[in-house]
Amino acid sequence: MTRPGLLMILCGTMLFSCSSRKAQEPQNIGINLENIDSTVRPQDDFFKYVNGGWLNRTTIPADQGRWGAFNELREFNNDVVLRVLKKAGENVVLYPEGTDQRKAADFYSIGMDSMLVENAGMQPVERFLAKINAIADKDEIYRYLAENVLVGGSAFFDFEVFPDLKNSKKMAAYVSSGGVGLPERDYYLKMDEKSRETRDKYRIHISNLFKLAGDAEDKAASSATTVLALETQLAKSMLSKEEKRDPVKLYNPKVITELNNIAQFVHWKEYLSILQAPADTIIVSEPEYLKACENVVHAYSLDDIKTYLKAAVLRRSAPFLHHAFVQESFDFNTKYLKGTDKMLPRWKRVLAVTDKYLGEAIGKLYVEEAFPAEAKEKALEMVENIKLAFADRIKLLDWMSDSTKHMALAKLSTFSVKIGYPDVWKSYSGLVIEKSPEQASYFTNVINAASFHVQDQIQKLGKPVDKSEWDMTPQTVNAYYNPLFNEIVFPAGILQPPFYDYRADEAVNYGGIGAGIGHEITHGFDDQGSQFDGEGNLKNWWAESDLEKFRAKGKAYADQFSAYEPLPGVFVQGEFTLGENIGDLAGLTIAFDGLQRYFKQHGRPDKIDNLTPEERFFMSFGTIWRTKSRDETLRSQILTDPHSPAVYRINGPLSNFEPFYETFHVVAGDSLFRPVSDRVKIW
């Protein structure tokens, strides 16, 4: 529950990916002319023009599914984090026993003890499997499900705590679909050859996990078949990923009696009592899915349900157990699904888990090392210029009524901005890291950390929301907009070259992180964010005629992206990616306007490397999204990720943006040219 699944759907983010390879410190931000491919005209393919040189000389590391600017910066940040974490571990004077930084260092150190993990074998997970074996009848399933939530597990559905969508000042309980092993509903339901193959591979994967847990081959194969069939039944009642983008559909408050009518097997009052969750109402994101859980429990035998629950435990545990489990998890989830040939080295895997569970303890050290105060001050100035530019845009819109403009400007005026790191650091005082030879294991500490975060969230139920909290750690190379807080958050981790350098040319900064800032701001006004008001509540503030015009513009933009074909027969899903695509176009637009405001304040700079400020702006925009992907990673992204492939995140918005046409003299006949009537202009 460090970042709830349903909340992740609602929050707009810039990009999700992992990193690898030996880090090189990012160069001082600017336009690297060696990355340009002069054989490509910018008017035809700006992505290849700006990045062609880089694409030609870059090989995706064997332990990565894709590689780009985000990965390169993550590599650099990984090295910084590892360095400061090791220093903390060695300095018992500054970080004595009981301090959060000592806990982070100990968590990492125990995770790195591969001999300890190998010697433990299956022992760390046996108590969880024993709990499943002890379920005597179906009336006891709810008890296991509740206890499983308390250790961060998921089966049948997810229980989460975050602000009430319609009363964002109060924390609420949510139940959403979950507890299946494939990434998304369509993996279970599509009937094309690749989807069928994936399900077969998944069945083999589950069988292998059962064999590693000690089952005979025949029993393991039979169990895997049962698991796939049961999960498929659950998937049939899930909302599509496009439907999940509608927060109105996800908001279905139910009192206990209503919940018992939907899914009686849970025994909701007792379930909440075990969780010590003081709630008499739960917001159900997918009532039909919850009904499907009830039907599955009735239709399947207790033994089959136990088999499903065991598979969920083994899937979750595998990355933290002995090598054979880790390898099996990698072979299916990363190698097969994403096409990555090589596993990340252990230190990177353990560091990522340490960051997930003790991220702010590490973040405090990272900020001291890598984020000076001046960097925060200049970033805040940039945010203000871009916000003002957006306000100007709203005032001049010819398709929006004055009443809706008034509400939009009111929402923008209440935007909260978090830059760099939290004002108040999270305390991990209640987290126990086992270090004694009798108790210590990597998996045990993962469970302890997960349990700490779950209980930390549950105890907030019914209480006022603490808006000072962050949903990303300071070292994260990403950013987000949270509609429930009406805030944008930019961690120190992404406020680094090549995205941002407080010492560098502002045209490049505005084209880089500035476009990202604009992207996140405008998430508050995309197909999801536009349904929340300035207080963060799910509330329509649009005139109906304006909403119809907005949707029509969005439909036209979605249709453009649906025509892109990254792989043969595999098209971008324009409706699914619409929010992020609007964010890219709008972010580009208001960042460009924000740069013009900066020039009025500070003067217009000269050419650099014979490039005008506008050319540098656009080239920086093209640079930050440079990415090479393996086909399987790209396929997985298209199926599960609301972000479009990198080439379209560049060429798509630019082909609709008039200043790009003016700067690079794009005319009819050029590949990026669109007739004026076809260009989408939303903000």
Residues covered by each model-derived region:
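Noncatalytic, helix-rich "gating/capping" subdomain that lines the substrate-entry/channel surface
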Residues: 88-385
